[in-house]
Amino acid sequence: MPKRNDIKKIMIIGSGPIIIGQAAEFDYAGTQACLALKEEGYEVVLVNSNPATIMTDREIADTVYIEPITLEFVSKILRKERPDALLPTLGGQTGLNMAMELSKTGILEELNVELLGTKLSAIDQAEDRELFKELCESINEPLCASDIATTVEEAINIADKIGYPIIVRPAFTMGGTGGGICDTEEELREIVANGLKLSPVTQCLIEESIAGYKEIEYEVMRDSADNAIVVCNMENFDPVGVHTGDSIVFAPSQTLSDNEYQMLRDASLNIIRALKIEGGCNVQLALDPNSYEYRVIEVNPRVSRSSALASKATGYPIAKMSAKIAIGMTLDEIINPVTNKTYAMFEPALDYVVAKIARFPFDKFENGDRHLGTQMKATGEVMAIGRNIEESLLKAVRSLEIGVFHNEMTEAIEADDEKLYEKMVKTQDDRLFYVSEAIRRGIPIEEIADLTKIDIFFLDKLLYIVEIENQLKVNIFEPELLKTAKKNGFSDREIAKLWNVTPEEVRRRRQENKIIPVYKMVDTCAAEFESSTPYFYSTYEWENESKRSDKEKIIVLGSGPIRIGQGVEFDYATVHCVKAIQALGKEAIVINSNPETVSTDFSISDKLYFEPLTFEDVMNVIDLEEPLGVIVQFGGQTAINLAEPLSKAGVKILGTQVEDLDRAEDRDLFEKALQDLDIPQPPGATATNEEEAVANANKIGYPVLIRPSFVLGGRAMEIINNEKDLRDYMNRAVKASPEHPVLVDSYLQGQECEVDAICDGKEVLLPGIMEHIERAGVHSGDSMAVYPPQNLSQAIIDTIVDYTKRLAIGLNCIGMMNIQFVIYEEQVYVIEVNPRASRTVPFLSKVTNIPMAQLATQMILGENLKDLGYEAGLAPTPDMVHVKAPVFSFTKLAKVDSLLGPEMKSTGEAMGSDVTLEKALYKSFEAAKLHMADYGSVLFTVADEDKEETLALAKDFAEIGYSLVATAGTAAFLKENGLYVREVEKLAGGEDEEGTLVEDIRQGRVQAVVNTMGNTRASLTTATDGFRIRQEAISRGIPLFTSLDTVAAILKVMQSRSFTTKNI
């Protein structure tokens, strides 16, 4: 059926800020869908609160609203825009839940807005556990034995009937939030109590555990004419029990017999047809390895993380097809954009193996609970393509950027046998490395299969990798063996280690023996049809399918997997860089390893190489393509770290040169540069051991800010107040050495600002200055930022502009740079300079309407600001006020402390814009899910040094009608100053929570919690009590503030919304 002509205007709801379980894959899906609908001639209106996305660029939709995805704001936009239809299945769980809410309020009916794509009834059937159970029973599809509980007692009764272990799944939550596997009644009580609070409908599914079954996924598509196909099927390396977002996944499935494959395929198509889904859908199934028994685990009736992976694994653009199906087109009339010959009805066939490995945030959160279960914990993922499992797995391992280049890890090598067994049985993020080590120690794979329930087929592949290692050790420089190792994904570095030579030597011998990679095309049809996609992966075989063109070529390095400190913002900059290169008539080639993002959509660049971002893999592409040069400014620290090795190998780095990058990153060189330019920085020094650090701190004076050099996102950074804490830090957090010094700086608790600047070598443009709401000491990525600044005097603004110009010219910056300042006692100091695009680029580009990454790329390629019509200096400021707010994923990460400090902890960002600061703040808090009730109680438990400042805030809360609750010390101080306060008991390290502030939080007696720890390393009880208070607030979804500056900001909002009542 051709597309519909009775609708003209379609609204799409985005997925909002990035959180664990809902990441960049929705930017990719949403961007594809908006463009697909525009391509078909519809007017597209987009609502999304996340400024860091390509999707929210002005050119992606006809009208873009960066507003909170809440009932209040989406309803306003619906009334204003009056669209004919709404497409909710591309915005993750956020988009779906919003559509459900809108439908329930009756506004869609009132405005006559039709829901496109999958019908609400089908979404309900797939998402509501009870309805889904009924549906599966009606079509004879087997589910796990289960029942719904709405209270803890009900859950216990159900569990007794089914038998332990039990899986708990709260209804309508994303990424398995609040769920888990329970072996005992005690565990069940705890998980269900929390799950019921997190479920918007207060219900949990209590079901039999089938841990140990194989987990298989089918990505399916169906249209309104009941045509249905399988786009891709995938198999998890880990058995059922680990969330598929955290599992290692292979596509296509590897261990299924043809009968099993067809049986599960039939089941998937059976379910999608019964649900009458129109568009993409993901079906998860569990298969008993010892029989033909299977269970349906769940269905996602929307585009998901798995569909982004399936799109990149096959080249079949699922989100684009889903959008076209939503407007009435059918699979047999949509052309497959990869081959431009076949129709979308044609099921993709793969002649390669794809491996996906998740990227976890535990390098940032050392105390986090690393155990993997049904709740997702990964922030991002990498994908690699090879001709066999070994090749794709090892390529994926080195794409992770966790300091390993092979499936071996120092911690695993150093573990004793007892620890090794424990780590194999416990599913953790690093289990692959312990399993590999067990095989190296000669533990039989049958025994490992028994312990881990990982299929013996996969373990046999790991055993083959170990056999190649053993042969390499004894056959040094043997060309045939070198070829075998390369065919199975071994890196030059790993071979060099086994041969005890340098990686350069291995590279030289490879080239002498003509052992160089060829590049194969991803074409969706296993080369059955001619294909024109410029989408390639490397392998060691015969025919090279990537033909070098005659055009001038530029290679752009992407930013790899999404992790805390390096998010989708860098992908945004990469895509804009590509656009600028193309606009100048050159060929843009992208190298990246992240399947979730827009930059790895093959229609974005002229050529896409899906490869690990390591020196070897990047160099191989450069050898083939012979580009004019490589741009490293937009790929975060990942790309910057490759600048030096590439430059040493004779590759031209475009933009700021390597020695100047070094001057910004290396502490001593940077200090010298600042002295030469006469720019002040906080007094500081470098230390290579504990004694030196103590001597430096005594000279500078406490408090000091201490951190290792060369980091992104403030890893292992702390504010320290005395010598005891400093010695503790030096022994616990860092391994200081002359190669890896530690930086000790005076900590100035002043106002923090940051600037992004663009420089052509002579002139400097500052699109804007952002002022941070939280004082210096909170990582810039976790601070709320306001543009234009509200509290800076003209003199200070002038100084900031002057210092920025001096630095950009003095460091020979070509392209982009980011500078952070602190203003202390009316003096401006420079804290740090990043000679690259930073995470504020998308936000600032959107609010100033200056396409910063594109402009910087033009500078890198030799244009200048004047010719492009830009005045040097600070760009004029707009009338609106814009606030960028950080968004955290603490609900997903047990045992991770939410206290803000110099270590970055946020996973995403939201934005609020309006005519006054108060309104913009209100929107940014709403968009970041920090909704404050209009009245209620606020709980204060603050450090002694913060009590004075708390008094003013408490008075303001009382003034607008909030009741005050506080622990003893804080309460006494507030009472002395004439406030009425209800006192609650501290935990005092005890287990009993009755009558304490934790019980108050748990029972919903407080609407907000203000908890500060001060700068002194607190006593153990205070620290653990504070941690328990914060955990409780987070798991109950109660706004928690650990910085008084944020409290002052939210009070501004509340005061602007409340009326004063005064007697006469």
From Swiss-Prot:
CDD domains for the chain: MGS_CPS_II
GO annotation terms (biological process): 'de novo' UMP biosynthetic process; glutamine metabolic process; L-arginine biosynthetic process
UniProt GO MF annotations: ATP binding; carbamoyl-phosphate synthase (ammonia) activity; carbamoyl-phosphate synthase (glutamine-hydrolyzing) activity; metal ion binding
UniProt: Mg(2+) 1 binding residues: Q284, E298
Name this polypeptide is given: Carbamoyl phosphate synthase large chain
Start and end residues of each MGS-like domain: 930-1064
InterPro entries, per the entry: ATP-grasp, ATP_grasp_subdomain_1, CarbamoylP_synth_lsu, CarbamoylP_synth_lsu_oligo, CarbamoylP_synth_lsu_oligo_sf, CbamoylP_synth_lsu-like_ATP-bd, CbamoylP_synth_lsu_CPSase_dom, MGS-like_dom
Residues at which Mn(2+) 4 binds: E832, N834
Species in which this protein is naturally found: Lactococcus lactis subsp. cremoris (strain MG1363)
